[in-house]
Amino acid sequence: METRYIEISLDTAKRLYEQGGEFRDIALTAFKEQELIGDRLPKTWDEYCAKHGEVGDRIKASLNTAYMTINKYTFSDYKQAQAHIAKMKLHLLRDDYRNGWKPDWKDGKLGKYVIESSEGECYVAKYIHISSFLAFQDEKTANEFLTNFRELIEEAGDLI
């Protein structure tokens, strides 16, 4: 089999990366994942870790260690432990999506867009005074977060 080498621009590699599968693999042979993600918001936990480089690697390693060291004395069952780790991931991801914004729950004029769950369904709602863990500065950001991390939100369960 003959091997050939191609040149690929960063913009082209970013488009390939977004397509996933083998295209993503091709993009990753030419550029680091951190370069391909750039400043955009992560769509997965792994992208969050890649975006944050060495710090992300340390966070990922710490959470993996937590998974392995959880025992019956810490949580009543493994599902509870997974829910707590999911919430820790959501906390870090949420702060990335907020980009420095923090909700002022005393401000009765400015609405906050929150992700909540009722009867097993997750959705975005607008609140003014009711505090919520997954609160965002605008509806678009809240919906994007919900789309990208619905499974993780469901895994965190009633901790949200």
Each model region followed by its residue ranges:
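Structural boundary micro-motifs
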Residues: 1-160
